[in-house]
Amino acid sequence: MPGIVTRFAPSPTGFLHIGGARTALFNWLYAQRHGGQFLLRIEDTDRKRSTQEAIDAIIDGLKWLGISYDGEIVYQSKRIDRHIEVANLLVEKGRAYHCYCPENEVAEKKIRAREEGKIYKHKCTHSTSNAEPVVRFKVPDSEDIVVDDKIYGQVTISSDQLDDIVILRSDNTPTYIFAVVVDDHDAGITDIIRGSDHLTNTFKQLLIYQALDFDVPRFAHVPLIHGEDGNKLSKRHGATSVCDYEKMGILPQAMRNYLLRLGWSHGNDEIISDEQAIEWFNLESIGRSPARLDFKKLEHLNNHYISNMSNEDILTLMLRENTLTDKKKGYLLQGLTELKKRANYLTELLDLAKFYIQVDLSEEAQQIVKSNLNVIKLLASFLSSVGSEDWNKNFLSSQIKEFSKLHNIKMSDIYHSLRAPITGIMDAPGIIDIMVILGKDECIKRLQAI
């Protein structure tokens, strides 16, 4: 499918949420699949609610996710002159008009119609006024508006259900409904993939496309994401913004895999690489029902990607805000092989690996140290006699068995007496493996520090 151009067009009124991230991913994958372009447009015409902080969060969120856009970012607010130009063109063509009706009057009529169970269809009743007018697009009477959606099929409503559409506010700023049509046309957008909550907007925008003789893009409206309880996603369901997931310790590749599977499927495949996603992605495999968040599935995916990442790459991520000596980095590089299998989050992995950096005795470890102090001292003395060249798993295991026989101490008590002072926690990988990684000097130092 040549010449595909998709876009992601968020409003910078908040952080990049998970629904927006999925929309961006689907548009990016569709463009990648067809050798097309993926553009980024910031829809910042709502001056009161748009913030630079939100713009930065959107850009940073896409960067973290690994979703790259083509060309320069388009800021909708910088195209207002173009929006006004096209609005005036519609007025000249008789497809739009200046409306002087006070906003509060229109709002009251809408409320009254709703209370009466009617559809309010605005017609301007004020030819002139001291107030600055809005520009309204004339919605034709009694016409079927048909959207040929790539997910829902043909969806039809009557134009009688629509009010005349405000396209320019009284301050000459464009409304979302209108600006999007102009911007998408000028950018050559061929395919619009967005949330199903935009379907009502599409009926209105289709009329504007037709009035301007613009080529109509293909539309695909993706069902929304719901919480695990089946209700519309909200903050009470937990993390909703991309930055929340990054802080939790989710890997971007795991997040991409997870977002892809929220509403799209490829047979029974769960673990899907970027290469496979680009090769397989299509609109036909997007379901019509809302996708549900499943944090257990996200944990499973994240554990998979953590487990399969190289120790060097994991260490780089773990140490972004920490400086360690080469010796401690060496401990971590060796220890991560076992630890990463246990972690569902990077933050969790950092906690699991903490004992390689420093020892903080847990309450349980403190109690064991207190109860086994004499055994710990004996072990420190006994292990000091082991040569550094013999400090390996097989030799240490045999020596500890000898120690058990010599002092008539259970092996389980010996392992506890080693684990508590050396790691500070009682739920860690095999203590002999840890001792080999730390080396003789560090182990003796930790045993003697008690």
Curated annotation (Swiss-Prot):
Query: Which reaction does this chain catalyze?
Result: tRNA(Glu) + L-glutamate + ATP = L-glutamyl-tRNA(Glu) + AMP + diphosphate
Q: Which CDD domains match?
A: GluRS_core
Please indicate the residue ranges that the annotation assigns to the motif 'HIGH' region: 10-20
Motif 'KMSKS' region in this chain: where? 232-236
Write out the entry's keywords from A to Z: Aminoacyl-tRNA synthetase, ATP-binding, Cytoplasm, Ligase, Nucleotide-binding, Protein biosynthesis
Compartments, record wording: Cytoplasm
GO MF term list: ATP binding; glutamate-tRNA ligase activity; tRNA binding; zinc ion binding
Q: Name the positions where ATP binds.
A: 235
Top-level taxon: Bacteria
What's the Enzyme Commission number for this chain? 6.1.1.17
Residue spans crossing the bilayer: none
Pfam families per record: Anticodon_2, tRNA-synt_1c
Annotated Gene Ontology cellular component terms: cytosol
Which processes are annotated in GO (biological process)? glutamyl-tRNA aminoacylation
| Entry similarity comment | Belongs to the class-I aminoacyl-tRNA synthetase family. Glutamate--tRNA ligase type 1 subfamily.
Q: Which NCBIfam families match?
A: gltX_bact
Provide the function of this protein: Catalyzes the attachment of glutamate to tRNA(Glu) in a two-step reaction: glutamate is first activated by ATP to form Glu-AMP and then transferred to the acceptor end of tRNA(Glu).
* Assembly description: Monomer.
What name does the UniProt record give this protein? Glutamate--tRNA ligase 2
- Organism (species): Wolbachia pipientis subsp. Culex pipiens (strain wPip)
